[in-house]
Curated annotation (Swiss-Prot):
Gene: gpmA
Domain of life: Bacteria
Residues engaged in binding substrate: 8-15, 21-22, 60, 87-90, 98, 114-115, 183-184
Naturally occurring in which organism (per UniProt): Staphylococcus saprophyticus subsp. saprophyticus (strain ATCC 15305 / DSM 20229 / NCIMB 8711 / NCTC 7292 / S-41)
Catalytic residues, chain numbering: 9, 87
Identification of the protein by name: 2,3-bisphosphoglycerate-dependent phosphoglycerate mutase
Length: 228
């Protein structure tokens, strides 16, 4: 029976500082490291054997993946990295303190950007965009698909084809798959898996650094889900 494990990265240093992060490539905080280590120990205690891992190109997700596999004695497992699992791109908000953003744009507007399904924040300015376009992580990426800002809906549009083409194929082969990613890229997957409404998915909370297990039928219908 296929098993899917979703894990949101542990707390990042920008999470701890209340900054919009998005595609900014920041490290885990000490708390985030400990969350990931604890989760890896839980995987080991439950005897969960992972066959393949999918993660993003961002350090906080990659390091979370490392701790999960290291603590469960599974560092040999293949890891596939893709930009399609990156966090939602927060555009011009990236790097801003959330309280400062509320003062600048108004609390209602910031709430709409954060918690609506199909409204994206302001785009990056040209200098910010160039810094991402020139990042080696994205040198293979067609500039025409490189986001300047994303809503949750936009994030889903890039995540679900990757699910259909790559991740789901491993599950259909009966594999146990770990997806170590971000709050919004995982929300996109959960919306698709559970057919969650546009209104409900924006308020869906996913614990940081905690494995969420999906037991699936052979045709990938959800039987059960639970946190370790």
């Amino acid at each position: 029976m296929p098993k899917l494990i979703l894990c949101r990265h542990g707390q990042s240093v920008w999470n701890a500082e209340n900054l919009f992060t998005g595609w900014a490539d920041v490290d885990l905080s000490e708390q985030g490291e400990n969350e990931a280590i604890t989760s890896g120990k839980k995987l080991k205690a439950q005897g969960i054997e992972i066959d393949i891992v999918y993660t993003s190109l961002l350090e906080r997700a990659i390091k979370t993946t490392y701790h999960l596999l290291n603590e469960s004695n599974q560092l040999f497992i293949p890891i596939i990295k893709s930009w399609r699992l990156n966090e939602r791109h927060y555009g011009g908000l990236q790097g801003l303190n959330k309280d400062d953003a509320r003062k600048k744009f108004g609390e209602d507007q910031v709430h709409i950007w954060r918690r609506s399904y199909d409204v994206a924040p302001p785009k990056q300015d040209e200098a910010q965009r160039e810094s991402y376009l020139n990042d080696r992580k994205y040198e293979h990426l067609d500039r025409r698909v490189m986001p300047e800002s994303e809503s949750l809906k936009d994030t889903l549009v890039r995540v679900i084809p990757y699910w259909n083409d790559q991740i789901s194929q491993q599950l259909l082969d009966g594999k146990t798959v770990l997806v170590s990613a971000h709050g919004n890229s995982l929300r996109a997957l959960i919306k698709y898996l559970e057919n969650v409404s546009d209104e409900d998915i924006v308020g869906y909370e996913i614990k940081t650094g905690a494995p969420l297990i999906y037991e699936l039928t052979d045709d990938l219908q959800v039987i059960d889900k639970y946190y370790l």
